[in-house]
Design a protein with these regions (language model features):
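Histidine-centered active-site microenvironments of extracellular/periplasmic hydrolases
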Residues: 1-21
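C-terminal cap/loop subdomain of S1 sulfatases and analogous C-terminal strand-loop tails that border
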Residues: 2-5, 22-31, 36-123, 154-160
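A general alpha-helix detector
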Residues: 41, 129-132
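Hydrophobic packing residues in well-ordered alpha-helices of helical domains and bundles
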Residues: 102, 141-144
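Intrinsically disordered, low-complexity polar regions and short flexible loop motifs
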Residues: 126
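Active-site-proximal N-terminal segment of extracellular/periplasmic enzymes that hydrolyze or transfer
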Residues: 131-139
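Short amphipathic alpha-helical coiled-coil/interface segments
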Residues: 137, 144-148
Length: 161
């Protein structure tokens, strides 16, 4: 369901067509990009400098979109889903995720802001998130949980205006 932070809710295809620069028919299923990466990436491809002082969270993946390399994220991705009228939906509890998630390399942790309901997945081996390995990797749960919960606390009041 798209109303969750499971891969089915946040993973989506991204299709780029730019005949003068991108060879048709290329597929990249390995690189992990996010919407915040689009601004610096598209500016770079278009030869446009980002505005002076720009400090967005996105990374420039121009070489990935141009088919010249695979991407390895330099920063973790974090999500917060739950500050709107759709939280607690869908009605099927099995489709509901905790409201925070962090992706760090192949690891993805879902957790609530109070530290409850931690679920850890190795996305490279388990892209459908069927095998929660949180019990086997408490150190990763602790590290990523602390990071995403701190991020949430620092940002939870932003975007309400």
């Amino acid at each position: 369901t798209k109303n969750s932070l499971y891969e089915g809710g946040i993973r989506m295809p991204f299709i780029v067509r730019y005949p003068k620069k991108i060879k048709a028919g290329q597929v990249n299923n390995e690189s992990v990009l996010c919407a915040v990466d689009l601004y610096p990436t598209l500016c770079s491809i278009a030869g446009i400098k980002t505005e002076k002082g720009y400090q967005g969270d996105g990374q420039n993946y121009d070489k990935v979109l141009l088919g010249k390399s695979k991407a390895k994220r330099k920063t973790d991705l974090m999500w917060d889903f739950g500050r709107n009228q759709f939280f607690k939906k869908p009605g099927n509890a099995n489709d509901r995720s905790p409201h925070l998630a962090i992706r760090s390399g192949n690891w993805k942790l879902l957790i609530n802001g109070d530290g409850s309901d931690a679920q850890l997945y190795d996305i490279a081996k388990d892209k459908f998130e069927k095998n929660d390995v949180a019990q086997s990797h408490p150190e990763i749960v602790a590290k990523l949980g602390e990071k995403v919960c701190k991020w949430f606390e620092e940002n939870k009041d932003k975007g309400k205006e």
